[in-house]
């Protein structure tokens, strides 16, 4: 490829030279042709014979001389130009003839010797300045630079090509001298050259070490290693390919000295044991430990051990050195690997602290870590193991418990649906009572000991008819094989009519709260009716709205009305005035505010204009406070608006139906017999039944009274339209919504009154003194007359 580029560059050189020659002939013709073959620039297109004599142009300055340029020449001085003397009148003809002859002669010579100046020459000298940088531009042109750069680029390309060829040749020579991987593998695996390879793992955090050695089987220092126990096996995360490892081993064997001079490298330290399994207390812990893995297969001749990855495609294991090769940091007097493994297995695995280990300083200078080695400070390892135990250990322990539970559950007999059984188990864990306490409370009828929430939970656990039959038919000797949900339900079903008892006890537990709610609701309805019918201010608002509406509806079918439905109160804010801000409700409230304020404050003749303004503002303020208090007067109306008549009626019906269920449970209990549990249940239920019947009768009477008052109140405001009401309590809802709108309008009216009062006070302060004197003068004159 590089040779092709060089050939292209060599072909481009003649082309560039030809282009340069053509460019030079076009732009620099004086170098390429002889003088006289072309008309000079200053020669005229036609001779000027009768042109008047003009003074000669000034001589051009000498061109600068550049001796270092190739085409430069020393400057030459122009020849002197002589001006001919003017001739007399007699000799005019001869002079003209001589001038014509001279002009004819000078047309073929240079323009510098012509006695007659030409227009183009004079114009060129006057309009165009003279530049002397043409030689320098010609020398530094792009074509010359291209001519110089192309050879330089060609030389550099040739040098690079030569270097590349040299490198390729050297690489081929080196590759020919090395043996192929297949031949190396054959040599290593041959019977005569069997090799013992030792592999291990050691990362930068000190978990192990890696050592690979390859030598002949005749070496006295190295011998085949047996397989290690299971806890010292460790899976390598990244394993090189088999061919690469054997190739490297063969290369090392080829460069290594004879076996007699080879000293084995120090064996790596043993890797840390795997995390121990948590102790188990169930039956699974009594099982025997798993057997160790089988030994590694031998080589073809059976003379040595090969790593596992050379014989089968499985995860390699870490093989330690023999017992004779002791790590320099270890001592033979220390504990055996089995004891260390047992000690490490008893310790739980902790969460890692990620840091970067620091190697000892190569300079030998003391560091802070050297001082800390002699420190007597010790940490509480038990607390560390408790606080920072690894999540994997926790999961392992939980998995062990789950496996034990699963093993037990596999032997359990499932009667309920799995999802229902799980839900019941969750409910049982949420209960604060045991199975025995629940059964005793159901037998005695003690609803207060269980509570409403627990009884509701029990009622949700009620099985279907088929599930109840299966649980009752289950043998008593096989109850231990049932799950927690099934065993609990079987114990509850052992009680006669258990879930009927639960329903009756739940009714008893909720009876008092239900009765109190109904009584309070009916009392609220009665109070709301009384407030709405007896509110003077509400009636005054209705009067103001009626009169305002009749005035606005004059001449229409809606005029001259004597009453209106209260729904029209909500439409007052939709009728806006001419300014687009004031609504009809604003107007009604302002009128009522003035009326209420005037009735509260005593009226009298004001002494001056300022006191009159103050009295008017105070009157509006007092009246607005009275109107805004209407929402507080009708508080029970707001509460009644939030009630639902259907809900109240259903609650009363449930109370009546619950009494019938209590009576049914009591009759079933009388059929059982007269044991202690039946007597206690009958006593508690019978006493409650008498009280419940009286309470229900009172609630039903209060319900009828409250609903009759509501109908009367609706008729009091709506007349015969009460029959058209779809909801009995709708009148309270309308009044509640109107009170909400009324509160907003009262706030707007209060802000408007404050702005009006401030503006009036400012106008009074800015009024002239004479106007204020005139305003005070009538009152003062009256005082004088009265005193006289």
Curated annotation (Swiss-Prot):
Annotated SUPFAM superfamilies: Formin homology 2 domain (FH2 domain)
Bilayer topology: Single-pass membrane protein
GO CC annotations, alphabetized: cytoskeleton; membrane
The FH2 domain, residue ranges: 340-768
Amino acid composition bias (Low complexity), ranges on this chain: 97-118, 209-219
Region Disordered, residue ranges: 48-118, 193-307, 322-347
One term of GO molecular function: actin filament binding
GO terms of biological process kind: actin cytoskeleton organization; actin nucleation
Domain of life: Eukaryota
Polar residues bias locations: 231-246
Residue ranges crossing the lipid bilayer per the database entry: 148-168
Compositionally biased spans, kind Basic and acidic residues: 327-342
Compartments, record wording: Membrane
Biased amino acid composition, Pro residues: 53-83, 257-279
Pfam family, one: FH2
Gene3D superfamilies: Formin, FH2 domain (1.20.58.2220)
The entry's keywords: Membrane, Signal, Transmembrane, Transmembrane helix
PANTHER family registered for this protein in UniProt: FORMIN-LIKE PROTEIN 15, FORMIN-RELATED
Family note: Belongs to the formin-like family. Class-I subfamily.
Protein name: Formin-like protein 15
UniProt source species: Oryza sativa subsp. japonica
Lineage: Eukaryota, Viridiplantae, Streptophyta, Embryophyta, Tracheophyta
